[in-house]
Amino acid sequence: MIFHANPGVIDLGVNIDHVATLRNARGTVYPDPIRAALLAEQAGADLITLHLREDRRHIRDADVRALRPQLATRMNLECAITQEMLDIACEIRPQDVCLVPERREEVTTEGGLDVAGRFELVKAACAQLAGAGIRVSLFIDPDADQIAAAAACGAPVIELHTGRYADAHTPAEQAAEFRRIADGADAGQKHGLVVNAGHGLHYTNVQPIAALPGIKELNIGHAIVAHAVFTGWENAVREMKAIMVAARLGTQYPAASTPA
């Protein structure tokens, strides 16, 4: 049985990349990211997010193929704009594909996709994916020009990059980044886009973002995997979802006290 607390209030996409990172660290078959995804669904995840990187540093092709038919919710596949990745996505046909920038030397995704600067490439990728019946999302910075370009190239969804908000060193810096995200959510809605957000969010910084009425979905992974070390996987998923829903409803979840 899949548990959903206040469905439709705000969606939680649980990213399973770092379950695969832990598996790959020792070259074992455990922990199994497929099992993690299915348990996350049972604990209240509204979708499962996974990033098939070109270097396959965590999620592998076999993970994506094995997981797709087993999910009861949605698969949100993150990938770079390369012909290889687009072809894999069109073969597997997840419900959603989020196009992201990618550099092999980065530890994690460092910024948003430059849709305005790579407009024709992004537009063609959106068309190919849409032709396969896949809903396309673009991972972008909360920038007015990028949001307008995303709408113009035919993507129905954007995911606002919250990394700078999450990594802010001072309250003033964090407040400024939060305002950019809030303004970006408003701009996205005015362009008729579904607005999601994610990157670097954890148990003590997610509340202001989750409270924004224009945000439909948050994608969170590393913080949930880290918290699960201490509380258990399903509990970590349930707690994150409860914190998000409480923030959206204007209340405070009592356990929101430590990042992990």
UniProtKB/Swiss-Prot annotation:
Q: Which residues form the active site?
A: 51, 78, 199
Of the GO CC terms on this record, one is: cytosol
Keywords from the UniProt entry: Cytoplasm, Pyridoxine biosynthesis, Transferase
Coiled-coil residue windows: none
Site (described: Transition state stabilizer):
159
- Pathway the protein acts in: Cofactor biosynthesis; pyridoxine 5'-phosphate biosynthesis; pyridoxine 5'-phosphate from D-erythrose 4-phosphate: step 5/5
Q: Where along the chain is 3-amino-2-oxopropyl phosphate bound?
A: 15, 26, 200, 221-222
Identify the residues that bind 1-deoxy-D-xylulose 5-phosphate: 17-18, 53, 58, 108
Q: What is its main location?
A: cytoplasm
E.C. number: 2.6.99.2
Chain's role: Catalyzes the complicated ring closure reaction between the two acyclic compounds 1-deoxy-D-xylulose-5-phosphate (DXP) and 3-amino-2-oxopropyl phosphate (1-amino-acetone-3-phosphate or AAP) to form pyridoxine 5'-phosphate (PNP) and inorganic phosphate.
Q: What is this protein called?
A: Pyridoxine 5'-phosphate synthase
